[in-house]
Amino acid sequence: MESLNVDMLYIAVAIMIGLAAIGAAIGIGILGSKFLEGAARQPDLVPLLRTQFFVVMGLVDAIPMIAVGLGLYMLFAIS
């Protein structure tokens, strides 16, 4: 029975990390497309848009890193 619980933990961690990566990829893709759209409409605002783009991209990318950290903690500390 213990082996089944450990196997399910491995699957849960893999799903958590995978879904976090997929979500971040979709979010960064949408963010990049909106940045390019805004830069094409208002070329004089590119420096302001670029700063906001990188700040928000860092925030979007931080969530999967937290999920990876939690997943690895669950994988190595709990099992």
Swiss-Prot record:
It is a multi-pass membrane protein. Coiled coil: none annotated. It is found in: Cell membrane. It holds the Pfam family ATP-synt_C. The keyword Cell membrane applies. F(1)F(0) ATP synthase produces ATP from ADP in the presence of a proton or sodium gradient. F-type ATPases consist of two structural domains, F(1) containing the extramembraneous catalytic core and F(0) containing the membrane proton channel, linked together by a central stalk and a peripheral stalk. During catalysis, ATP synthesis in the catalytic domain of F(1) is coupled via a rotary mechanism of the central stalk subunits to proton translocation. Key component of the F(0) channel; it plays a direct role in translocation across the membrane. A homomeric c-ring of between 10-14 subunits forms the central stalk rotor element with the F(1) delta and epsilon subunits. This is ATP synthase subunit c. It comes from Buchnera aphidicola subsp. Schizaphis graminum (strain Sg).
